[in-house]
Amino acid sequence: TPVGAGDFSQYITPVLNSGADVLILNHYGKDMINSLSQAVQFGLRDKQVNGKNFEIVVPLFSRLMAQGAGDAIKGILGTTNWNWSLQDEGSKAFVQSFGAEYGAPPSMAAHTCYVQTLLYANACEMAGTFYPPEVIKQLEGFNFDGMGNGPTLYRAEDHQCFKDVLVVRGNDNPSSQFDLLKVVDVTPRAQVEYDWTIFGGELGPYEVKM
């Protein structure tokens, strides 16, 4: 679908009588809010196909998207990179310090910024310089833990970050505007890793062109 389509009815209508029992809304931001809200309005969340409940899936949730979709989020499956309800020591420490400063639990985006800042600072320290190519080399193949989703790898070959994936479902009875997504399962990292060569491409040389 075109980015910023707004009206997704022409794409949702054919799904109604297609025989499909899953709709994956591979959208982000306002497009996800609009497409999900409209899919629910069309009755897909309550639909049954061949005796099975129809499922709407959002591949990657954010708090702002969940809040923007309102009640349409209830019961909807998806994934997220982190959730403030995690009980590992790193997550609890971050939630406590963030809450003390801002009066609310951190979002997934806040967690990402926090983790990336720590990783960059650590890479600069290991490299002994801010020179980008040397910092990059420190991050390539770097393993770390303690940030919420278990052992994590920055793969050297394509710079992709791999960790356990949280499967979430929109909370039917949220206790607050921050309790919209409930973790229902965790997919192990090994199940989402893939062969880096399938997409081809080159990362480029370790040099900065002036």
Regions found by a protein language model. Give the residues of each.
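Extracellular/periplasmic Venus flytrap/periplasmic-binding protein
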Residues: T1-F42, W84-A93
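Rossmann-fold dehydrogenase core element
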Residues: D71-N81
